[in-house]
């Protein structure tokens, strides 16, 4: 028979310990935690009701100002968010002006609360821009930038810019801004016109003193879609951003572009400038790279076509895609002001299975470098039903080290050169023969390991709009790679011409697939 006195005493002691445990647990847990679920609730509620277009309260003087005047409006560094806190991250804000004429709400998330960051004109230096202080006292911010000592410990550098629609730009150590990422793209390149969703509200978590990453959230809104986003930013030699998103459709869309990247291509060795220019190339990116679910690597050099061009690449469960700047030598650009050799490449690394769909490349004609004319994104085969969440997770990499992005198992395209084809005559002169010629240099470890006498050959395919006049491969002693020469006779110059090529050694594929589109009227 049990000792009841012992049982009672033990029970009371256990209860006392249990009470202490519960008390400790309550004190150990945070009183609350902000998450993407909080933003998703707002996005879902917005999607269930009609779209309300944002209203602008920007005075006409600011809306109509020139870029040079807008540049004069600078944020006061000593007003930065967390200026006096022991964290390497600082937040500065953009003033409204020009086409940045819609205010976004920005909040700070702390361990205990969410507080809106209030606009004040005292935060800005207006330079020589004359303005009525009363007219701007309640304007609000156009966006924000994130500062971090990425290049040297005693200097804060801008590493992220959130400004305009759902655009954001990110750079790593030693990089300069080039291409942009976006939250969402809708109906890009459709005749009905593109819809540009915008981030209307942000929540930025206050980092701890030793945090090497920054977390922020965004609420996206547009006439036919809403979305909740979580970004975790890791500054470094290659800055990376983990993105988690939930998108809700208000209405049906023709095309949904996920993880979109936007860039610029004006001219380069594969499409020389139409007018004389001291720069050999002028672009933020020179190609689209795709790592397909089946392991194939594809490289599509970019063009500045005379007419809108849309290319699709059917890929199930992509392992990655991005717009890259493969040329990293200054002499390839010769631009001391804009330093295209330092522009970052952008790479999308999916998390989880994305299923069936395609990577789409949109190339838009442009006459100058101020227009972003290149867009790349993923489109799912099946769109979500209206009101149902579409969840997507991926990591964005911003890098100047393309070798880290590409697999060492395959050689890659170093450059694509295009010219009028010719034939060497008996007197050693070259006579044009009406063909279009391509020189494609492949480099990489699989080629370096080969003897220069190795029987490397090419596998090519060309569309119905051209005949192959020459297909040859030779060792390139300068790059320690191989150069493919193709000469094509285009049948109808008013039509585009597709071609693909890869190098092989017997039955072993040595390189990525070079996939080129010769635009119409070239």
Curated annotation (Swiss-Prot):
Record keywords, A-Z: Periplasm, Signal
UniProt protein name: Glucans biosynthesis protein G
Purpose of the protein: Involved in the biosynthesis of osmoregulated periplasmic glucans (OPGs).
Single Gene Ontology MF annotation: catalytic activity
Biological process according to GO: beta-glucan biosynthetic process
Pathway membership, UniProt: Glycan metabolism; osmoregulated periplasmic glucan (OPG) biosynthesis
Pfam families according to UniProt: MdoG
Signal sequence, renumbered to the chain: 1-33
Family: Belongs to the OpgD/OpgG family.
Cross-referenced InterPro entries: Gal_mutarotase_sf_dom, GH-type_carb-bd, Glucan_biosyn_MdoG/MdoD, Glucan_biosyn_MdoG_C, Ig-like_fold, Ig_E-set, MdoG_OpgG
Gene name per UniProt: mdoG
Organism: Sodalis glossinidius (strain morsitans)
Subcellular location: Periplasm
GO terms under cellular component: outer membrane-bounded periplasmic space
């Amino acid at each position: 028979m049990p000792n009841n006195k012992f049982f009672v005493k033990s029970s009371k002691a256990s209860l006392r310990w249990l009470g202490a445990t519960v008390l400790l647990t309550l004190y150990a847990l945070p009183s609350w935690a902000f998450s993407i679920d909080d933003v998703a609730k707002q996005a879902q509620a917005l999607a269930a009701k009609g779209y309300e277009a944002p209203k602008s309260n920007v005075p006409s003087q600011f809306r109509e100002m020139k870029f040079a005047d807008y540049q004069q409006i600078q944020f006061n560094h000593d007003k930065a968010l967390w200026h006096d806190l022991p964290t390497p991250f600082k937040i500065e804000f953009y003033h409204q002006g020009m086409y940045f004429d819609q205010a976004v709400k920005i909040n700070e998330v702390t361990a205990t609360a969410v507080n809106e960051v209030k606009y004040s004109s005292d935060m800005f230096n207006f330079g020589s821009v004359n303005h009525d202080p009363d007219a701007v006292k309640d304007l609000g911010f156009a966006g924000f930038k994130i500062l971090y000592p990425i290049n040297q410990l005693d200097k804060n550098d801008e590493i992220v810019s959130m400004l305009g629609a759902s655009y954001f730009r990110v750079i790593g150590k030693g990089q300069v801004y080039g291409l942009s990422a976006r939250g969402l793209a809708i109906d890009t390149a459709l005749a009905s016109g593109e819809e540009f969703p915008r981030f209307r509200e942000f929540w930025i978590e206050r980092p701890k003193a030793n945090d090497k990453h920054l977390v922020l959230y965004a609420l996206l809104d547009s006439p036919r879609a809403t979305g909740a986003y979580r970004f975790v930013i890791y500054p470094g030699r290659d800055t990376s951003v983990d993105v988690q998103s939930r998108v809700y459709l208000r209405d049906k869309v023709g095309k949904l572009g996920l993880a979109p990247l936007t860039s610029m291509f004006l001219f380069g060795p594969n499409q020389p400038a139409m007018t004389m220019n001291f720069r050999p190339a002028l672009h933020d990116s020179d190609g689209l790279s795709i790592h397909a679910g089946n392991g194939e690597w594809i490289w599509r050099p970019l063009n500045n076509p005379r007419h809108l061009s849309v290319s699709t690449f059917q890929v199930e469960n992509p392992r990655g895609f991005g717009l890259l700047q493969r040329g990293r030598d200054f002499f390839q650009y010769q631009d001391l002001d804009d330093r295209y050799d330092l522009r970052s490449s952008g790479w999308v690394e999916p998390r989880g299975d994305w299923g069936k769909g395609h990577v789409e490349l949109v190339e838009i004609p442009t006459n100058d470098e101020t227009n972003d004319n290149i867009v790349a994104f993923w489109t799912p085969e099946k769109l979500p039903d209206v009101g149902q969440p579409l969840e997507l997770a991926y990591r964005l990499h911003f890098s100047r080290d393309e070798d880290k992005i590409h697999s060492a198992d395959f050689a890659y395209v170093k450059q694509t050169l295009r010219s009028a084809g010719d034939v060497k005559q008996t007197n050693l002169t070259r006579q044009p023969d009406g063909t279009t010629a391509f020189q494609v240099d492949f480099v990489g470890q699989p080629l370096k390991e080969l003897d220069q006498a190795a029987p490397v050959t090419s596998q090519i395919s060309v569309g119905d709009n051209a005949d192959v006049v020459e297909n040859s491969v030779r060792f390139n002693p300068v790059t320690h790679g191989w150069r493919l020469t193709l000469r094509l006779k285009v049948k109808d110059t008013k039509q585009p011409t597709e071609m693909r090529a890869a190098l092989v050694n017997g039955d072993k594929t040595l390189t990525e697939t070079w996939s080129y589109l010769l635009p119409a009227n070239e």
